[in-house]
UniProtKB/Swiss-Prot annotation:
Protein's name according to its UniProt entry: Sperm mitochondrial-associated cysteine-rich protein
Secretion signal, residue range per the UniProt entry: none
Gene Ontology cellular-component terms listed: cytoplasm; mitochondrial outer membrane; mitochondrion
Residue positions, PTM Phosphoserine: 37, 44, 110, 128
Function: Involved in sperm motility. Its absence is associated with genetic background dependent male infertility. Infertility may be due to reduced sperm motility in the female reproductive tract and inability to penetrate the oocyte zona pellucida.
Subcellular localization: Cytoplasm; Mitochondrion membrane
Region (Disordered): 101-143
Lineage: Eukaryota, Metazoa, Chordata, Craniata, Vertebrata
Topology versus the membrane: Peripheral membrane protein
Length: 143
């Protein structure tokens, strides 16, 4: 009796809360853990205690020559999680879902330059609004 009860219990990340092992495939909905292959293979039990056996694919189309020491488990040994135009990704994203996983470094530098210009422009603009804000505060004080 313990066996059927275990079979009925189904881990939420892999199988839905409905009956664990219906006549249909175990996981009709492809969860994020296994985007391409089914979550529970027909040969294996419907809901194994272990997580999805299928490893997440690595959509990073970058060769092994990419100078990226960080190789997360999501990417195979032949694939690095950084494009050719990038040095490396300091924070390896989850399975390199975004092909531009390293563009964050470049964007960070660009943002720094842009933010500097924005601050200069911003410092000039705020000089006008302060008067409006001051009047608003006075109105609130009167109330």
């Amino acid at each position: 009796m313990s066996d059927p009860s275990k079979t009925n219990q189904c881990p939420p990340p892999c199988c839905p809360p409905k009956p664990c092992c219906p006549p249909k495939p175990c996981c009709p909905q492809k969860p994020p853990c296994c985007p391409k292959s089914p979550c529970c293979p027909p040969k294996s039990p419907c809901c194994p205690p272990k997580p999805c056996p299928c490893p997440p694919p690595c959509p990073c189309p970058c060769p092994a020559t990419c100078p990226c020491p960080l190789k997360p488990p999501c990417c195979p040994q032949k694939c690095s999680c950084c494009p050719k135009k990038c040095t490396c990704c300091p924070q390896p994203p989850p399975c390199c879902a975004q092909p531009t996983c390293c563009s964050s470094e470049n964007k960070t530098e660009s943002d720094s330059d842009t933010s500097g210009q924005t601050l200069e422009k911003g410092s000039q603009s705020p000089q006008s609004p302060p008067g409006a804000q001051g009047n608003w505060n006075q109105k609130k004080s009167n109330k």
